[in-house]
Amino acid sequence: MKRERGALSRASRALRLAPFVYLLLIQTDPLEGVNITSPVRLIHGTVGKSALLSVQYSSTSSDRPVVKWQLKRDKPVTVVQSIGTEVIGTLRPDYRDRIRLFENGSLLLSDLQLADEGTYEVEISITDDTFTGEKTINLTVDVPISRPQVLVASTTVLELSEAFTLNCSHENGTKPSYTWLKDGKPLLNDSRMLLSPDQKVLTITRVLMEDDDLYSCMVENPISQGRSLPVKITVYRRSSLYIILSTGGIFLLVTLVTVCACWKPSKRKQKKLEKQNSLEYMDQNDDRLKPEADTLPRSGEQERKNPMALYILKDKDSPETEENPAPEPRSATEPGPPGYSVSPAVPGRSPGLPIRSARRYPRSPARSPATGRTHSSPPRAPSSPGRSRSASRTLRTAGVHIIREQDEAGPVEISA
């Protein structure tokens, strides 16, 4: 009986250990499947350049693997599918001439575009293997950051101003992150320093003298970074501003006075020059008229003080006199020159003879005769006894005196 009981107990113990033995046997057997590994899980790409999605797989099978790359979207997009390195089917137009596969299953994307950004999944399967290997890699595509600059309305600000704004600007770059620096160090937490949600704009509220410093900004993204040149912000005290404004006003006033003082003499000089030119023009006109004026006796007081006779020779036989008839004698009622009286013509003149045109001779100096003295005409040459001289000429001098002198055989009286 004891022997039977011992055998039953040993059998029951064996049944209890059987599941554990079975599990142990399963774990020790080799698994038939593909194992995929990748050195990186995140790759940062640059627009226009290439990115390598690198993977490696291992399998007990020696058959060629079937590789499939997909871009995770709401609806997955198949990038490429191949047996080994041989592409199966037709590539999408977006990836044509930009795809290259390697023996280990890696994928090379050329000429990256912003649309290439996303999560890529690779699946590798082999016919003899039971399990399919999978792996995901994240790819980002960005544009490099161009050099930023700090933009301000003015580099000077008055103390206790309500707000002063600085803007960090750059032309190119995706996914930028901004950092503000004061004197080359990151800004400390200050209730007066306000940043916009994207930290691109810095606003200083209630400006103090301690805000007078150098400011710059730094912009970064996954592939590049840039730092602006520092900008000096000058804070003026209010009392200093009044001094600057008053000094500037005085300088401006002195400048205006100096300009006006220099401008007036030049204007006077211009007027003087115009007057001088006018006088020269008048002198030139006087010089042109002087020869004609010298042939006429002077009028006015000089004639009253020094009257003189004007002798005009007339040729009786000249044919010129026929064209120019003698002027009519002045009537008795017609007034003569003031201060003078002319005696009537002597009746010894031949009225029918033609009068020759007057020939003008230069004036000869003559002494002024005494008042009431009678002058006789100079004696004629004996070679022309039969020719009588007569002159009748009207002369206007200065628009005042008209003197008509007749030279006959008899004398001409000039009374004062």
From Swiss-Prot:
Task of the protein: Involved in regulating cell motility and cell-matrix interactions. May inhibit cell growth through suppression of cell proliferation. In glia, associates and targets CLCN2 at astrocytic processes and myelinated fiber tracts where it may regulate transcellular chloride flux involved in neuron excitability.
Example GO biological process term? regulation of cell cycle
The record's principal subcellular location, in a coarse class, is cytoplasm
Q: Which disease is it linked to?
A: Megalencephalic leukoencephalopathy with subcortical cysts 2A: A neurodegenerative disorder characterized by infantile-onset macrocephaly and later onset of motor deterioration, with ataxia and spasticity, seizures, and cognitive decline of variable severity. The brain appears swollen on magnetic resonance imaging with white-matter abnormalities and subcortical cysts, in all stages of the disease.
Subcellular location(s) per record = Cytoplasm; Cell membrane
The record ties this protein, via Pfam families, to: Ig_3 (PF13927), V-set (PF07686)
Q: What is this protein called?
A: Hepatic and glial cell adhesion molecule
Annotated signal peptide: 1-33
Which SMART domains does the UniProt record give? IG (SM00409), IGc2 (SM00408)
